[in-house]
Design a protein with these regions (language model features):
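Non-catalytic C-terminal accessory region of glycerolipid acyltransferases
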Residues: 154, 178, 182, 195-327
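Short hydrophobic/aromatic residue motifs in ordered secondary structure
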Residues: 39, 144, 310-311
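General small-molecule cofactor/ligand-binding pocket signal
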Residues: 121, 188, 271
Protein backbone atom coordinates (compact mmCIF):
# COMPACT_ATOMS: atom_id res chain seq x y z
CA UNK A 1 0.00 0.00 0.00
CA UNK A 2 1.19 3.48 -0.66
CA UNK A 3 1.29 6.29 1.82
CA UNK A 4 -0.84 9.20 0.74
CA UNK A 5 -0.17 11.06 3.95
CA UNK A 6 -2.94 13.45 4.74
CA UNK A 7 -1.56 16.75 5.81
CA UNK A 8 -4.83 18.30 6.89
CA UNK A 9 -7.30 15.98 8.58
CA UNK A 10 -9.46 18.99 9.38
CA UNK A 11 -10.61 19.02 5.75
CA UNK A 12 -14.06 17.58 5.04
CA UNK A 13 -13.86 13.81 4.67
CA UNK A 14 -15.04 13.88 1.05
CA UNK A 15 -12.10 16.11 0.03
CA UNK A 16 -9.58 13.67 1.46
CA UNK A 17 -8.23 10.94 -0.85
CA UNK A 18 -8.18 7.33 0.24
CA UNK A 19 -4.99 6.25 1.92
CA UNK A 20 -3.73 3.20 0.11
CA UNK A 21 -3.84 2.13 -3.50
CA UNK A 22 -5.81 -0.23 -5.67
CA UNK A 23 -2.91 -2.66 -5.92
CA UNK A 24 -2.60 -2.65 -2.16
CA UNK A 25 -6.22 -3.71 -1.76
CA UNK A 26 -5.75 -6.33 -4.47
CA UNK A 27 -2.74 -7.67 -2.58
CA UNK A 28 -4.72 -7.91 0.65
CA UNK A 29 -7.52 -9.79 -1.10
CA UNK A 30 -5.10 -12.18 -2.79
CA UNK A 31 -3.26 -12.77 0.48
CA UNK A 32 -6.57 -13.45 2.21
CA UNK A 33 -7.59 -16.00 -0.41
CA UNK A 34 -4.25 -17.80 -0.28
CA UNK A 35 -3.50 -17.64 3.45
CA UNK A 36 -6.84 -17.21 5.17
CA UNK A 37 -8.18 -14.80 7.76
CA UNK A 38 -5.75 -15.62 10.59
CA UNK A 39 -2.55 -14.90 8.65
CA UNK A 40 -4.14 -11.86 7.04
CA UNK A 41 -4.83 -10.43 10.49
CA UNK A 42 -1.18 -11.11 11.38
CA UNK A 43 -0.13 -9.21 8.25
CA UNK A 44 -2.29 -6.33 9.38
CA UNK A 45 0.05 -5.48 12.25
CA UNK A 46 2.97 -4.22 10.12
CA UNK A 47 0.60 -2.65 7.58
CA UNK A 48 -1.44 -0.79 10.20
CA UNK A 49 1.73 0.17 12.08
CA UNK A 50 3.06 1.81 8.91
CA UNK A 51 -0.09 3.86 8.40
CA UNK A 52 -0.28 4.66 12.10
CA UNK A 53 3.29 5.97 12.24
CA UNK A 54 2.99 8.02 9.03
CA UNK A 55 -0.33 9.70 9.88
CA UNK A 56 0.61 12.18 12.59
CA UNK A 57 -2.56 14.22 12.12
CA UNK A 58 -4.64 11.05 12.36
CA UNK A 59 -2.96 10.09 15.63
CA UNK A 60 -3.57 13.56 17.06
CA UNK A 61 -7.25 13.54 16.11
CA UNK A 62 -7.64 10.02 17.44
CA UNK A 63 -6.24 11.11 20.80
CA UNK A 64 -8.58 14.11 20.86
CA UNK A 65 -11.51 11.78 20.20
CA UNK A 66 -10.54 9.48 23.07
CA UNK A 67 -10.09 12.49 25.34
CA UNK A 68 -13.65 13.49 24.53
CA UNK A 69 -14.89 9.99 25.31
CA UNK A 70 -12.97 9.87 28.58
CA UNK A 71 -14.12 13.29 29.75
CA UNK A 72 -17.71 12.85 28.58
CA UNK A 73 -18.06 9.45 30.22
CA UNK A 74 -16.86 10.86 33.50
CA UNK A 75 -19.09 13.92 33.44
CA UNK A 76 -22.24 12.31 32.06
CA UNK A 77 -22.04 8.92 33.71
CA UNK A 78 -22.18 7.22 30.31
CA UNK A 79 -21.13 3.60 30.13
CA UNK A 80 -17.70 3.42 28.50
CA UNK A 81 -14.92 0.86 28.24
CA UNK A 82 -12.45 3.76 28.45
CA UNK A 83 -12.07 3.92 32.22
CA UNK A 84 -8.44 5.08 31.96
CA UNK A 85 -6.80 8.17 30.45
CA UNK A 86 -6.28 7.42 26.73
CA UNK A 87 -2.86 6.35 25.51
CA UNK A 88 -1.01 5.27 22.38
CA UNK A 89 -2.44 1.76 22.59
CA UNK A 90 -5.97 3.14 22.33
CA UNK A 91 -5.03 5.09 19.21
CA UNK A 92 -3.33 2.08 17.61
CA UNK A 93 -6.17 -0.25 18.52
CA UNK A 94 -8.61 2.01 16.70
CA UNK A 95 -6.43 1.95 13.57
CA UNK A 96 -6.04 -1.82 13.84
CA UNK A 97 -9.77 -2.38 14.29
CA UNK A 98 -10.36 -0.44 11.10
CA UNK A 99 -7.94 -2.76 9.33
CA UNK A 100 -9.78 -5.77 10.75
CA UNK A 101 -13.05 -4.37 9.47
CA UNK A 102 -11.51 -4.21 5.99
CA UNK A 103 -10.51 -7.88 6.24
CA UNK A 104 -14.04 -8.76 7.29
CA UNK A 105 -15.34 -6.79 4.33
CA UNK A 106 -13.10 -8.80 2.03
CA UNK A 107 -14.57 -12.00 3.45
CA UNK A 108 -18.13 -10.70 3.23
CA UNK A 109 -17.86 -9.31 -0.28
CA UNK A 110 -15.81 -12.23 -1.57
CA UNK A 111 -18.82 -14.52 -1.59
CA UNK A 112 -17.25 -17.06 0.74
CA UNK A 113 -19.12 -18.72 3.58
CA UNK A 114 -19.23 -16.26 6.46
CA UNK A 115 -18.73 -18.17 9.69
CA UNK A 116 -18.60 -15.30 12.17
CA UNK A 117 -20.99 -15.60 15.11
CA UNK A 118 -23.54 -12.81 15.49
CA UNK A 119 -25.31 -11.82 18.70
CA UNK A 120 -28.50 -9.86 18.10
CA UNK A 121 -29.66 -7.19 20.53
CA UNK A 122 -33.23 -6.04 19.99
CA UNK A 123 -34.01 -8.92 17.67
CA UNK A 124 -37.70 -8.45 18.41
CA UNK A 125 -37.49 -5.14 16.58
CA UNK A 126 -35.89 -6.89 13.63
CA UNK A 127 -38.79 -9.37 13.63
CA UNK A 128 -41.18 -6.42 13.42
CA UNK A 129 -39.12 -5.03 10.55
CA UNK A 130 -39.84 -8.15 8.52
CA UNK A 131 -43.56 -7.44 8.64
CA UNK A 132 -43.28 -3.95 7.17
CA UNK A 133 -43.22 -2.98 3.52
CA UNK A 134 -39.96 -1.08 3.77
CA UNK A 135 -37.79 0.78 6.24
CA UNK A 136 -34.80 3.06 6.62
CA UNK A 137 -31.91 1.83 8.78
CA UNK A 138 -29.84 4.73 10.09
CA UNK A 139 -26.29 3.91 11.11
CA UNK A 140 -22.88 5.57 11.28
CA UNK A 141 -19.21 4.91 10.64
CA UNK A 142 -18.89 2.78 13.72
CA UNK A 143 -18.43 -0.96 13.30
CA UNK A 144 -19.12 -2.76 10.03
CA UNK A 145 -22.37 -2.38 8.10
CA UNK A 146 -21.21 -4.79 5.40
CA UNK A 147 -21.08 -7.56 7.98
CA UNK A 148 -24.56 -6.58 9.09
CA UNK A 149 -26.03 -7.01 5.63
CA UNK A 150 -24.68 -10.54 5.38
CA UNK A 151 -25.66 -11.46 8.93
CA UNK A 152 -29.21 -10.22 8.36
CA UNK A 153 -29.71 -12.73 5.55
CA UNK A 154 -29.87 -15.48 8.17
CA UNK A 155 -32.72 -13.69 9.97
CA UNK A 156 -34.91 -12.26 7.23
CA UNK A 157 -35.68 -12.44 3.54
CA UNK A 158 -35.88 -8.65 3.43
CA UNK A 159 -33.08 -7.16 1.35
CA UNK A 160 -30.90 -4.51 2.96
CA UNK A 161 -29.68 -2.14 0.27
CA UNK A 162 -26.64 -0.06 1.19
CA UNK A 163 -26.63 3.56 0.09
CA UNK A 164 -22.95 4.23 -0.65
CA UNK A 165 -21.15 7.45 -1.48
CA UNK A 166 -18.73 6.04 -4.07
CA UNK A 167 -16.37 8.88 -5.01
CA UNK A 168 -14.16 8.64 -1.94
CA UNK A 169 -14.11 4.82 -2.11
CA UNK A 170 -13.38 4.50 -5.80
CA UNK A 171 -10.42 2.12 -5.42
CA UNK A 172 -12.27 -0.26 -3.14
CA UNK A 173 -15.38 -0.32 -5.35
CA UNK A 174 -13.24 -1.16 -8.38
CA UNK A 175 -11.62 -4.07 -6.59
CA UNK A 176 -14.98 -5.37 -5.38
CA UNK A 177 -16.27 -5.31 -8.92
CA UNK A 178 -13.35 -7.44 -10.05
CA UNK A 179 -13.41 -9.89 -7.14
CA UNK A 180 -17.15 -10.46 -7.00
CA UNK A 181 -19.44 -8.34 -9.21
CA UNK A 182 -22.47 -9.98 -7.60
CA UNK A 183 -21.49 -8.36 -4.31
CA UNK A 184 -22.49 -4.97 -5.71
CA UNK A 185 -26.10 -5.91 -6.39
CA UNK A 186 -27.12 -4.78 -2.90
CA UNK A 187 -25.25 -1.48 -3.20
CA UNK A 188 -26.94 1.71 -4.38
CA UNK A 189 -24.05 3.97 -5.47
CA UNK A 190 -24.73 7.70 -5.42
CA UNK A 191 -22.94 10.96 -6.03
CA UNK A 192 -25.78 13.29 -5.06
CA UNK A 193 -29.39 12.96 -3.95
CA UNK A 194 -31.44 14.22 -6.90
CA UNK A 195 -34.91 13.52 -8.27
CA UNK A 196 -33.87 10.40 -10.18
CA UNK A 197 -32.10 9.02 -7.13
CA UNK A 198 -35.17 9.69 -4.99
CA UNK A 199 -37.42 7.84 -7.42
CA UNK A 200 -35.08 4.86 -7.38
CA UNK A 201 -34.96 4.77 -3.58
CA UNK A 202 -38.73 5.14 -3.31
CA UNK A 203 -39.19 2.16 -5.62
CA UNK A 204 -36.83 0.09 -3.46
CA UNK A 205 -38.83 0.93 -0.33
CA UNK A 206 -42.13 0.20 -2.08
CA UNK A 207 -40.74 -3.22 -3.07
CA UNK A 208 -40.21 -4.00 0.62
CA UNK A 209 -36.47 -3.42 0.89
CA UNK A 210 -34.68 -1.93 3.88
CA UNK A 211 -32.43 0.96 2.96
CA UNK A 212 -29.28 1.26 5.06
CA UNK A 213 -27.42 4.54 5.21
CA UNK A 214 -25.04 6.40 7.48
CA UNK A 215 -26.14 9.72 8.94
CA UNK A 216 -22.93 11.04 10.47
CA UNK A 217 -21.07 12.53 7.48
CA UNK A 218 -21.79 15.55 5.33
CA UNK A 219 -22.10 14.67 1.64
CA UNK A 220 -20.02 16.37 -1.03
CA UNK A 221 -23.05 17.67 -2.91
CA UNK A 222 -24.46 19.62 0.03
CA UNK A 223 -21.80 20.61 2.60
CA UNK A 224 -23.87 23.63 3.57
CA UNK A 225 -26.91 21.57 4.61
CA UNK A 226 -25.70 20.90 8.11
CA UNK A 227 -27.15 21.34 11.57
CA UNK A 228 -24.95 21.48 14.66
CA UNK A 229 -26.09 19.53 17.69
CA UNK A 230 -24.41 18.49 20.96
CA UNK A 231 -22.21 15.43 20.56
CA UNK A 232 -19.67 14.21 23.12
CA UNK A 233 -19.48 17.53 24.91
CA UNK A 234 -19.35 19.92 21.96
CA UNK A 235 -21.35 20.99 18.93
CA UNK A 236 -20.78 18.78 15.89
CA UNK A 237 -22.12 19.19 12.34
CA UNK A 238 -24.53 16.51 11.14
CA UNK A 239 -26.11 16.33 7.68
CA UNK A 240 -29.75 17.14 7.13
CA UNK A 241 -29.92 14.93 4.03
CA UNK A 242 -30.63 11.51 5.61
CA UNK A 243 -33.54 12.93 7.59
CA UNK A 244 -35.02 14.81 4.66
CA UNK A 245 -34.65 11.61 2.64
CA UNK A 246 -36.37 9.55 5.33
CA UNK A 247 -39.23 12.05 5.53
CA UNK A 248 -39.75 11.84 1.76
CA UNK A 249 -39.73 8.04 1.81
CA UNK A 250 -42.38 8.07 4.55
CA UNK A 251 -41.46 4.74 6.12
CA UNK A 252 -40.40 3.57 9.61
CA UNK A 253 -36.86 4.39 10.71
CA UNK A 254 -34.55 2.29 12.89
CA UNK A 255 -31.04 2.83 14.19
CA UNK A 256 -28.73 -0.11 13.68
CA UNK A 257 -25.07 -0.78 14.47
CA UNK A 258 -22.88 -3.84 13.91
CA UNK A 259 -19.67 -3.95 15.98
CA UNK A 260 -16.98 -6.62 16.16
CA UNK A 261 -16.84 -7.68 19.81
CA UNK A 262 -14.23 -10.41 19.47
CA UNK A 263 -12.12 -11.97 16.72
CA UNK A 264 -14.98 -14.13 15.48
CA UNK A 265 -18.09 -12.46 16.88
CA UNK A 266 -20.19 -9.43 16.04
CA UNK A 267 -22.86 -7.67 18.08
CA UNK A 268 -25.82 -6.18 16.21
CA UNK A 269 -27.93 -3.51 17.91
CA UNK A 270 -31.25 -2.48 16.42
CA UNK A 271 -33.68 0.02 17.94
CA UNK A 272 -36.87 1.63 16.62
CA UNK A 273 -36.27 5.33 16.03
CA UNK A 274 -39.51 6.69 14.53
CA UNK A 275 -42.65 5.38 12.87
CA UNK A 276 -42.16 8.16 10.35
CA UNK A 277 -39.95 11.23 10.06
CA UNK A 278 -42.18 14.27 9.81
CA UNK A 279 -40.97 17.76 8.88
CA UNK A 280 -44.03 20.03 8.95
CA UNK A 281 -43.70 23.35 7.11
CA UNK A 282 -43.11 26.09 9.66
CA UNK A 283 -41.52 23.69 12.14
CA UNK A 284 -39.21 22.09 9.58
CA UNK A 285 -35.93 23.46 10.97
CA UNK A 286 -36.90 22.79 14.57
CA UNK A 287 -38.00 19.25 13.78
CA UNK A 288 -34.81 18.57 11.82
CA UNK A 289 -32.81 19.71 14.82
CA UNK A 290 -34.85 17.48 17.15
CA UNK A 291 -34.47 14.38 14.96
CA UNK A 292 -30.73 14.92 14.56
CA UNK A 293 -30.34 15.55 18.29
CA UNK A 294 -32.04 12.24 19.05
CA UNK A 295 -29.82 10.43 16.57
CA UNK A 296 -26.65 12.07 17.94
CA UNK A 297 -27.62 11.08 21.48
CA UNK A 298 -28.12 7.49 20.36
CA UNK A 299 -24.82 7.49 18.48
CA UNK A 300 -23.08 8.97 21.50
CA UNK A 301 -24.14 5.95 23.54
CA UNK A 302 -22.48 3.53 21.12
CA UNK A 303 -19.36 5.66 20.74
CA UNK A 304 -18.86 5.57 24.50
CA UNK A 305 -19.42 1.82 24.54
CA UNK A 306 -17.25 1.05 21.48
CA UNK A 307 -14.80 3.96 21.11
CA UNK A 308 -12.16 1.81 19.40
CA UNK A 309 -14.59 1.11 16.56
CA UNK A 310 -15.30 4.74 15.63
CA UNK A 311 -13.97 4.99 12.08
CA UNK A 312 -14.18 8.70 11.32
CA UNK A 313 -10.51 9.60 10.93
CA UNK A 314 -10.93 13.34 10.45
CA UNK A 315 -11.86 16.33 12.59
CA UNK A 316 -15.49 15.43 13.15
CA UNK A 317 -16.19 18.61 15.13
CA UNK A 318 -14.67 20.96 12.55
CA UNK A 319 -17.23 23.53 11.48
CA UNK A 320 -17.69 26.94 9.90
CA UNK A 321 -20.40 29.47 10.56
CA UNK A 322 -20.80 29.76 6.80
CA UNK A 323 -21.62 26.11 6.27
CA UNK A 324 -23.40 24.99 9.42
CA UNK A 325 -26.50 26.07 11.22
CA UNK A 326 -27.43 26.17 14.85
CA UNK A 327 -31.13 25.79 15.54
Amino acid sequence: MQSNAISDNSSPWYLRPERGSEWGLRFMMLFYRLCGKFLTRVLLYPVVTFFFLTDRAGRRLSREFFERIYQHSGSSGSCSVLSHPPGVWDDFQRFYNFGCSMVDRIEVWGGTSWTTNVTWHGLQHFDCLQEQDGAVLMSAHIGNLDALRVASKTKTEKEIKALVFTKNSDHFMKVLNIVNPDALKDVVPIQNIDILTMLKLKNLIDEGNALGLVADRVTEGSPERVIEVPFLGDLAPFPQGPWILASLLGCPVYTIFCVRAERNRYDVFIEPFADKITLPGKQRETKLHDWICSYALNLEKYCCRFPHHWFNFYDFWSRSSKTSRRV
